[in-house]
Amino acid sequence: MARKVVVVDDEKPIADILEFNLKKEGYDVYCAYDGNDAVDLIYEEEPDIVLLDIMLPGRDGMEVCREVRKKYEMPIIMLTAKDSEIDKVLGLELGADDYVTKPFSTRELIARVKANLRRHYSQPAQDTGNVTNEITIKDIVIYPDAYSIKKRGEDIELTHREFELFHYLSKHMGQVMTREHLLQTVWGYDYFGDVRTVDVTIRRLREKIEDDPSHPEYIVTRRGVGYFLQQHE
């Protein structure tokens, strides 16, 4: 079955170009041209991925992202203006998975779509026999096969990307990972040197797993280098 893509952009020529090229790649494509219609369309079609412009009539892209994240975890790629760094950061903090700046290459955007779909919907390897893949770090337990974690027995709700990042760090306990390395391994493609994505995702993770995010006990910053997961006895 073909993957569903919702394209949201108030510039119809851009939406039409994306629709044409995505259909050539075998996707089912649905378009909306304002924020209110976008929310309705996403709820109706429940797509596998959303391409979401920020500047929209009605609700803007940030509001749409916030609303959709209340119910769905599909990847969201934000389409941002060339120099709007604040929009990129806010979009990521609201739960967007990726962003592409305008003007963009259609080929690049389709590559991002494929990468996000591959990362989000890839299935973890099935456990065999009675072997457990659980990873315990102090009072946190990671369940890789279930893509879930618990802290002191309570579920912690993570996005797919947040889980992937935390799980990767847990497999390399105590090793400092540069932002560039994390982009390559966790996101799975080159972010063209923009490492803010990692910082924002780390901040979201800390807010969910740390007792005091301003003094983290799990995800530690090595200033000027990157991040590592602190070992605990």
Curated annotation (Swiss-Prot):
Post-translational modification: Phosphorylated by WalK on Asp-53. Phosphorylated by PknB on Thr-101.
The entry's keywords: Activator, Cytoplasm, DNA-binding, Phosphoprotein, Transcription, Transcription regulation, Two-component regulatory system
Role: Member of the two-component regulatory system WalK/WalR that regulates genes involved in cell wall metabolism, virulence regulation, biofilm production, oxidative stress resistance and antibiotic resistance via direct or indirect regulation of autolysins. Functions as a transcription regulator by direct binding to promoter regions.
Domain Response regulatory residue range list: 4-117
Cytoplasm keyword on record: yes
Subcellular location: Cytoplasm
Record-listed 4-aspartylphosphate modification sites: 53
GO CC term (a single one): cytosol
UniProt GO MF annotations: phosphorelay response regulator activity; transcription cis-regulatory region binding
PTM annotation (Phosphothreonine): residues: 101
UniProt name for this protein: Transcriptional regulatory protein WalR
Main location: cytoplasm
Top-rank taxon, per record: Bacteria
UniProt miscellaneous comment: Overexpression of walK/walR reduces susceptibility against vancomycin.
